[in-house]
Amino acid sequence: MIRKAFVMQVNPDAHEEYQRRHSPIWPELEAVLKQHGAHHYAIWLDAQRHLLFATVEIESEARWNAVAQTEVCQRWWKHMREIMPSNPDNSPVSQELKNVFYLE
């Protein structure tokens, strides 16, 4: 498994809405993530700085990257773009993080 972590932002007035939209996520999005080898996906909110810290374990980079090309992922991005900074393709602005320590 490949462990990934990344940071995104949520608009200051949208913390509760962000959580509501993820409680639960669309079943078809959950299915696509699992079909593409995503496991143990978690998102944490730093409410003071409006940051979202995400971790996920994936089976391969290629399968993970392929999620972005699915119709359901593109609909999800469009659904979320009004409550978080987004790129021109509607994907959330995110910064991948480098792992510097892990204890199993």
From Swiss-Prot:
S-S bridge residues: none
Look up the record and give one Gene Ontology term from the biological process aspect.
rhamnose catabolic process
Name the active site residues: 22 (proton donor)
The EC code for this enzyme is 5.1.3.32
* Annotated positions binding substrate: 18, 41, 76-77
Known catalytic reactions: alpha-L-rhamnose = beta-L-rhamnose
Hydrolase as a keyword of this entry, yes or no, is no
HAMAP family named in the record: L_rham_rotase
Task: State the name under which the record lists this protein.
Answer: L-rhamnose mutarotase
- Give the organism, scientific name: Cronobacter sakazakii (strain ATCC BAA-894)
